[in-house]
Amino acid sequence: MRKRISTTSNQPSERTLQSELFGREVQFNYSETWLAYSMLGLRLVMAWVFLQAGLEKLLDGGIGDPLAWSSAGFLNNAVPEANPLHGVFLFFAEFGAIVDPLVIFGQILIGLALLFGAFFRFAALMGAIQMFFFWTAAWQAGVAAGLPVENGYVIDSSFVYMLLLFGLGAWGAGRLLGVDRYLEETELVKQNPSLRFLLG
């Protein structure tokens, strides 16, 4: 994919992005300022979504029982039998001792990473994978039925979150007032450019 960004002459705060999308040349103008604000805003919103979800699960049983929350009830009962992956989620339910901490602490760590813009692309990828599992668990039936979800077809909040995380990672939103901006200047990253794929 070819991408070129150039500054327009009459509006210094606007830029033009030219790229190729599905084999066609596309271009659009955007405001640098508003793009930065919107990326930062979306990043903080997604950080809150994950952090709140993880902390609610962690504190479900109170301070004295931090791992009282269990995914088993959801995996055993909430995934419809018509869901083509029903058996997969029943299998996961057998391993609550592994799945529960992964979900709880995964959500908290993803939320913190998004909040502080640290290892952003890695965190966004992990969050998108988690949202993918939540999305597939919401299927009421299979492809032949149109992939119905709770309030419609195909698209639900998990799907939207998954796409938002993909977009934020693609734009490198972790560099906006984030730790990744400084991590990229370290000697370790400069000597190992592949680490940049985890940052940004």
Regions found by a protein language model. Name each.
Residues 1-79, 85-109, 116-200:
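Extended, low-polarity transmembrane helix blocks
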